[in-house]
Regions:
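M16/insulysin-pitrilysin zinc metalloprotease superfamily fold
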Residues: 337-338, 344, 352-366, 375-380, ...
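Strongly charged, low-complexity linkers/loops
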Residues: 364-374, 378, 384-457
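Residue-level detector of well-ordered alpha-helical segments, enriched
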Residues: 317, 330, 340-348, 372, ...
């Protein structure tokens, strides 16, 4: 029997606000444990939360960018459960009236071809929990409350995703939208973007969904892909063995490529939601929403379309450049300097991405002057330096943020522009390679390429290849 996979994702993103959602504590990542904590986010009796207005703005911005309807009258609710990383024993979230509803993101339909819409059921604001630390002590678990109260958006999709590849593309597109809107850095390795993956399978032709399981807090694209494929296969094997899939929460172990049952899957009634009594409802005016709408940046899909029509870039080029807002900023500044969008794109997709990959650096963590790449391209295209030298200059810019012109001068990388000097070197090379010269004159075309290579080596790559070729042909006749 053949089966269809059905997936829905709950994507959690930490917002790039300076302070937490209900207090003034810092949201900075990586501080000393429990150094960004106050009475409010620690849940001390008698404290009262106050909503961070920037969180509301970012939620509306995200909703508009994902085609959602903004709920003019929305409110917070309490989600009640006990866990050591939740000091109040409840989480302030939104259940009944979330701030954004009924949106969508378009992705590639991997099953039927073309494109499809993954519907977004809702986007709601909530506070993050703390973090349990298990690996520093052998006899106890520690709790770091720095993350407690950091503002989150939870983006809940409908079960419209039919395979692992679609799930990854959906999260990639969400990440790009969030980054372009400036609401989150989406650094998955720091936990600022993570996904809860809901998976079920159903026989082809069936009309009812199968029993779903959930795998929580998956924080890489590879893990999302592998978790979905593994869980779908596990459920198929359970069904074909004559058993029933259990509705449960499972933990994905990416290192082992498998998941483990944690607990039975909870429903909303298990959390005993009720309206948050310490926070008033939020009422948003049409003017407020329209102001945010007008301030939206050019979003990834619109930017891709413009790059293709205005610059003649390919689908592949635009997908790569628009995969990170950092690439986009570098690309647009480089085009502004060089006036050459195709060279700018190829340098970013080639040398810049190679340097990032080799150094295991994220695009968001690039620290060199964005004007430098444009200047390097100008130097190479103006025959001031060779392609190989340009790569070396970029590597120095990447690691040490050097000035390209100063680096070229200090390392004597300037191209030889004196045709007389080039001719002298070519003549010397020909005198040293009489056999190759005679073979070329005897009709062996490959010897010409050999001689060019010898000339470029003698010139240490510091002469334009076209000029060397021209002089070589003139001498050989």
């Amino acid at each position: 029997m053949e089966y269809n996979t059905v997936c829905g994702l709950e994507v959690h993103t930490e917002l790039s606000t300076k302070t937490k959602i209900f207090c003034n504590c810092s949201t900075a990542f990586g501080g000393e444990p429990n150094s960004h904590v106050c009475e409010i986010c620690a849940g001390m009796p008698g404290t009262l939360p106050v909503v961070n207005e920037r969180v509301v703005e970012y939620a509306v911005r995200t909703g508009l960018a994902t085609n959602c309807t903004i709920t003019r009258y929305n409110k917070f609710d309490r989600k009640n459960y006990f866990y050591p990383d939740l000091p109040k024993a409840y989480q302030i979230s939104q259940l009944y009236l979330p701030i954004c509803q009924n949106g969508y993101v378009e992705i590639t339909d991997q099953i039927n071809g073309g494109t499809k819409k993954v519907r977004i059921k809702e986007i709601h604001m909530e506070e993050d929990a703390g973090k349990l630390v298990h690996d520093e002590w052998s006899d106890c678990t520690l709790v770091n409350y720095n993350r407690c109260g950091v503002p989150l958006l939870e983006i809940v999709s409908e079960p419209d995703i039919a395979c692992a590849d679609e799930a990854v593309e959906y999260v990639e597109k969400l990440r790009a939208i969030l980054q372009f809107c400036g609401v989150s850095d989406c650094k998955m390795q720091e936990g600022s973007l993570r996904a809860d993956v809901n998976v079920s399978v159903m026989p082809v032709g069936a009309t009812e969904y199968g029993t779903r399981t959930e795998m929580k807090n998956i924080n890489s694209f590879r893990a999302i892909h592998n978790a979905i494929e593994s869980e779908a296969q596990r459920q198929i094997e359970v069904i074909e063995d004559g058993s029933a899939v259990t509705q449960e929460t499972r933990r994905w172990d990416d290192a082992k490529g498998t998941s483990y049952a944690m607990r039975s899957k909870e429903d909303a009634q298990d959390y005993k939601y009720f309206p948050e009594p310490d926070l008033p409802p939020i009422e948003l005016s049409d003017e407020y929403i329209d102001t945010i709408r007008q301030q939206l940046p050019e979003l990834p899909e619109a930017k891709k379309a413009r790059y293709k029509s205005e610059y003649g870039l390919t689908d592949y080029d635009t997908d790569m450049i628009c995969s990170s807002v950092s690439y986009v900023r570098l690309f647009e500044r480089t085009v502004e300097i060089t006036g050459n969008p195709k060279d700018s794109a190829h340098w970013i997709m080639g040398e810049v991405m190679k340097l990032l990959n080799d150094s295991q650096t994220l695009p968001e963590d690039m620290r060199f002057n964005p004007d430098a790449l444009g200047r390097i391209i100008q130097l190479q295209n103006g025959n001031k330096i060779s392609r190989d030298s340009a790569k070396k200059v970029l590597a120095a810019v990447f690691t040490d943020n050097v000035d390209p012109d100063e680096y070229v001068k200090q390392n004597k990388m300037e191209m030889v522009s004196d045709t007389g000097a080039i001719r002298k070197v070519v003549e010397d090379v020909l005198a040293q390679n009489e056999k190759a010269v005679n073979e070329y004159k005897g009709g062996k075309a490959a010897s010409f390429n050999f001689l060019i290579g010898q000339c470029m080596r003698a010139l240490r790559g510091k002469a334009p290849a076209a000029e060397v070729t021209k002089i070589l042909k003139e001498i050989l006749g």
